[in-house]
């Protein structure tokens, strides 16, 4: 059956497009940069969560409340621009290591990560340290590293590269993302089923701005109080005691309680524990039930039960008694699970690509619909030309930084993989609302290794390999809120300037207060080493005579067998008509630690079998607001503790 047969293009609403960027949104951006960003950085280092959606909610709520008391009614265009500004400023960050950790805090989070990597014992033990290029980070014996400061000449080139990359990336993403939107929305007329979610949220907040109190605010307020109370124990106590003690007091172990060493006599190499953040349970409320069930089953069977079996038959060889969750997960991954991860990525990616290709069988009306007046459009060829030129600049920069790497491979990333991946992703957003199954697993790493290049510089270069598919849905949301596209351009580049300055300022202050990671930042101290190990393993795989652990860990036979098994599971799920979401949960659970899968599963069970019956049909509406309210309250109390810590440590440094 054609999956698209019921997807018909609906005529757009006829409201006039309006400007969403003005002085009020600039003030909101400044508030986010100077108030929310440092809180996000500090909380990310302590708990690993950052502010996330809380930054968006807090900023919008504050703006709405100020406007109400000033007898000003905010337009939905202004509210939506502020909403995406908060996401851009606070959530922007770096995916480090294996991709499981996101380091929030703007552009300079990249340099903070690299200063840790260059002086980490893992980079040194693998022989990577002398090969890390100076244009990426100063050497570990530099005063810039020893004194923990960005105000040093050794940081000049890395900082310039960070700024150039952030400007160039936005030019690249806006131009190609706009072209994707025009193709998928105006020509192919895809429905983008998830786009109305954000647009309706902005509309609801605009109604609140008009002093219309709704049930949303009651639910949100109660949830926020829960977040404040829990955050007082989870964040405030460790933060405040960290000012007075070498090791902060933690009423709840951050980020989890780990039972790995306790169960090793029964389940050697098995992992088990549970995350102590209440947000993990609330996340189980919101995520699709079958996704959570699949994630928990897969995580428990693979990481808790499967590892001991693999250890007993000699596949997992490097596990040693006494290993906690992090080192045990590293050796288990290297011995076996990295091959299953690659296989699962291949399967999910091919499924997404197959759905995209088969969707072409639908006979779209290839006549472009009339472009709404005042939307902020410009010709597609101009957009593609801007994207082409920005990609060329990326290739030139990469060739200058890594002249020995084949320039044709830079072009392969920029002019083939990026467009293909982005277009496939954009179509998946247009058809299903999500594109989590569209990816080319480890193609970047495989290209580096198989290219014959010898050196480590390529692993630190700004390769023009991006997925801009989500931009098509973002432009669709702008259209639904009747916001001029130019509002987003102006807001994003204004936010970029604020983000660069605030990221530089607050990372400088926080890094100066204590080494990152250290006992002051418990989440970073526990989780960053795992990512550093994987980074070092990948980077040394292309060194002349360097470490070959990563290459040796990847076994084509294991990948092939795993791919076949995963495809058989997918086929069984289709035949038995089990929800396909269960399959994607199974795939995601392979690499999910039980520490997170277990509390999410508890949350999913509570939500489906208790809360849904207790509250009734409205539970479906309450779920996302409960999580957002909790995140807001948690973020607010976290920001208060962060403010106290920053002031106290700054005064302490001034005195002494």
Placement of each model-derived feature along the sequence:
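Alpha-helical multipass membrane-protein architecture
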Residues: 1-656
């Amino acid at each position: 059956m054609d999956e698209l047969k019921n997807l018909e293009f609906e005529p757009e609403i006829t409201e006039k497009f309006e400007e969403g960027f003005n002085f009020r949104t600039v003030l909101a951006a400044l508030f986010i940069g100077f108030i929310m960003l440092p809180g996000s950085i500090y909380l990310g280092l302590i708990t690993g969560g950052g502010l996330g959606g809380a930054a968006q909610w807090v900023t919008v709520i504050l703006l709405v409340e100020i406007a109400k008391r000033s007898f000003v009614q905010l337009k939905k265009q202004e509210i939506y621009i502020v909403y995406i500004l908060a996401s851009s400023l606070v959530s922007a960050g770096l995916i480090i290591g294996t991709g499981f950790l996101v380091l929030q805090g703007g552009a300079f989070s990249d340099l903070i990560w690299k200063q840790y990597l260059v002086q980490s014992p893992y980079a040194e033990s693998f022989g990577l340290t002398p090969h890390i290029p100076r244009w990426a980070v100063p050497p570990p014996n530099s005063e810039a590293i020893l004194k923990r400061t960005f105000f040093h000449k050794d940081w000049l080139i890395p900082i310039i590269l960070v700024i150039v990359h952030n400007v160039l990336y936005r030019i690249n993403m806006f131009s190609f993302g706009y072209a994707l939107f025009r193709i998928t929305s105006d020509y192919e007329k895809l429905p983008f089923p998830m786009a109305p979610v954000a647009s309706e949220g902005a509309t609801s907040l605009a109604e609140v701005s008009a002093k219309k109190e709704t049930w949303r605010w009651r639910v949100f307020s109660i949830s926020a109080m829960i977040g404040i109370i829990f955050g007082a124990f989870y964040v405030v106590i460790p933060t405040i005691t960290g000012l007075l003690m070498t090791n902060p007091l933690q009423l709840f172990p951050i980020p989890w309680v780990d039972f790995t060493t306790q169960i090793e006599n029964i389940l050697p190499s098995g992992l088990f524990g549970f995350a102590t953040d209440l947000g993990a349970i609330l996340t189980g409320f919101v995520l699709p039930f079958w996704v959570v069930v699949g994630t928990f089953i897969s995580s428990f069977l693979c990481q808790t039960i499967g590892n001991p079996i693999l250890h007993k038959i000699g596949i997992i060889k490097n596990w040693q008694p006494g290993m906690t969750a992090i080192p045990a997960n590293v050796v288990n991954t290297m011995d076996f699970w990295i091959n299953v991860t690659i296989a699962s990525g291949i399967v999910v990616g091919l499924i997404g690509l197959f759905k995209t290709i088969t969707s072409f069988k639908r006979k779209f009306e290839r006549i472009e619909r009339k472009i709404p007046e005042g939307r902020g459009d410009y010709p597609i060829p101009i957009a593609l030309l801007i994207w082409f030129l920005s990609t060329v600049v990326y290739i030139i920069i990469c060739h200058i930084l890594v002249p020995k790497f084949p320039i044709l491979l830079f072009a392969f990333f920029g002019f083939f993989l990026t467009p293909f991946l982005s277009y496939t992703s954009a179509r998946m957003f247009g058809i299903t609302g999500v594109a989590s199954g569209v990816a080319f697993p480890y193609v970047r790493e495989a290209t580096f290794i198989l290219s014959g290049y010898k050196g480590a510089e390529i692993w630190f270069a700004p390769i023009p390999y991006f997925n801009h598919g989500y931009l098509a849905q973002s432009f669709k949301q702008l259209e639904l809120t009747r916001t001029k596209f130019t509002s987003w351009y102006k807001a994003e580049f204004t936010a970029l300037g604020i983000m660069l300055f605030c990221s530089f300022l607050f990372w400088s202050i926080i890094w100066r207060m204590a080494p990152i990671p250290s006992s002051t930042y418990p989440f970073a101290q526990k989780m960053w080493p795992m990512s550093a190990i994987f980074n070092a393993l990948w980077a040394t795989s292309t060194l002349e005579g360097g470490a070959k652990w990563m290459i040796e860990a990847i076994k084509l036979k294991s990948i092939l067998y795993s791919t076949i098994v995963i495809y058989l599971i997918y086929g069984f799920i289709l035949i038995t008509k089990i929800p396909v979401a269960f399959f994607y949960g199974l795939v995601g659970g392979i690499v999910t630690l039980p520490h997170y899968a277990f509390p999410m599963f508890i949350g999913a069970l509570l939500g489906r079998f208790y809360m849904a019956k207790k509250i009734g049909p409205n539970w479906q509406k309450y779920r996302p607001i409960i999580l957002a309210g909790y995140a807001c309250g948690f973020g607010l109390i976290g920001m208060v503790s962060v403010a106290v810590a920053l002031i106290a440590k700054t005064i302490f440094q001034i005195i002494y």
